[in-house]
A protein has these predicted regions:
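C-terminal alpha-helix plus adjacent terminal tail
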Residues: 26-52, 56-237, 244-254, 286, ...
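CoA-thioester-processing core
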Residues: 1-32, 231-293
Length: 399
């Protein structure tokens, strides 16, 4: 095994590679130093002793050893051996700057370098029992919606590099959404009952997609307006955002509101191991409890209480709201993208430092900076000259 980037390329061994060596594999730091700077790597029994691998097997017994290991791991699983759930292609309708899914819409404004991401709750009553949830399969709202959201985030990240700001909106019936998620949580065994494998996997997918949004290097601003559906897991979108503006419109038939549920009490943890509410109100359990107190009776948090509770950044009336949102969008897109990537990555991950937060909340942005330094990609940089007979020339100043 080897990670030869430092001695050969003058950069780091993959995003988080070093962190995984010491945090995940538990390799001693001085041995990790040797491993990371020896181009030929570490072989055989030494790799086992240094905890880089679990075992070594000769070529003649390698397949047998792998098979035995796989069987031992399989015996620990409580997943049944029956049929899985087929996931059909999402096949969104892409029309110019708009990508339209069943429950998600992504609209790009390339000129302003902004995007609008709208996520919709279920339009009909969802299955409420374990069997009916499983029978719904890939058409289950939670599974379909979060697959679409995942796809939209990936399209945004990979195809629209110059888009720097995303407005988050939600639509739908909050009660239908809360009913659907309550049934899913029950089926997944979060209340202490028997966990159904399918419901659990759907819940884990939801957790991963929220984490993907957490580590997406775009400014996110949530807009809570009359007709929004920031309830349950969709409220997590609100607390993933870098800012949240709420419209207080006294003339609206239904005021802008936020509804919390058991989904916000730790079912979808961040990479730091805390819920988004716990991260928002770090070491302030009283504030977390005050927000979650609205959950049992599904009491809506309306504008009057939202700012007092701290669940949004600002509440503005119908006169100030449009201008304040517009000014924020204009100001944010005028700032340095590099500075914002570093700032947002640090501010989003308050609380405990974990392997996940080190890799995605710190190293991704930091390592990209190292890759653009002259020592890596300059005319005499290690990456530029890799494979040539010339030796790189380094600026030896530590920064």
């Amino acid at each position: 095994m080897s990670l030869p980037e430092v001695p050969l390329l003058g950069v780091l061994p993959g995003t988080g590679g070093l962190t995984r060596v010491v945090d995940k594999r538990k390799v001693r730091r001085d041995l990790a130093d040797v491993f990371s700077t020896v181009a030929e790597g570490v072989k055989g029994q030494r790799a086992v002793e240094w905890k880089l691998v679990d075992a070594v097997a000769p070529k003649s017994k390698f397949e047998e050893a792998v098979s035995e290991r796989a069987k031992a791991l399989a015996q620990k699983s409580d997943r049944p051996g029956g049929n899985g759930v087929k996931l059909d292609g999402l096949r969104p309708n892409v029309d110019g700057n708009s990508t339209q899914y069943r429950y998600v819409t992504l609209t790009i404004d390339a000129g302003r370098r902004t995007a609008e991401l709208t996520v919709r709750g279920p339009s009909e009553v969802q299955p409420s029992t374990v069997d009916s949830i499983r029978n719904k399969g890939a058409e289950l709202w939670a599974l379909r919606c979060y697959r679409e959201l995942d796809d939209a985030l990936l399209r945004l990240r990979l195809n629209h590099l110059e888009v720097g700001l995303v407005t988050l909106r939600t639509e739908g019936n909050p009660q239908l959404l809360l009913d659907a998620e309550a049934a899913l949580l029950e089926a997944a065994g979060t209340n202490g009952g028997q966990a159904d494998w399918f419901a659990r996997e759907v819940l884990l997918l939801m957790k991963r997609v929220h984490k993907r949004l957490d580590v997406t290097s775009r400014t996110f601003v949530a807009l809570i307006e009359p007709g929004s559906c920031f309830a349950g897991s969709f409220a997590e979108l609100l607390w993933s955002a870098d800012r949240a503006y709420m419209l207080d419109d006294p003339d609206a038939d239904t005021p802008a509101q936020i509804l919390v549920s058991a989904m916000n009490a730790g079912a979808l943890p961040m990479g730091n191991g805390l819920s988004r509410l716990e991260t928002r109100f770090l070491d302030d359990s009283a504030s977390v409890k005050a927000v979650l107190a609205y959950a049992p009776e599904r009491k809506a948090i309306e504008p009057d209480d939202a700012e007092k509770l701290g669940v949004v950044t600002f509440v503005r009336d119908d006169i100030d709201y449009p201008d304040e949102v517009r000014l924020f969008l204009e100001e944010r897109t005028s700032l340095s993208p590099d500075a914002l990537v570093g700032m947002e990555a640090n501010l989003r991950f308050a609380g405990p430092e974990t392997m996940e937060t080190k890799i995605f909340g710190r190293l991704s942005a930091w390592q990209n900076w190292i890759f653009t330094r002259a020592n890596a990609t300059g005319n005499k940089g290690a990456l530029t000259l890799y494979g040539s007979p010339e030796r790189p020339e380094f600026d030896l100043r530590r920064c």
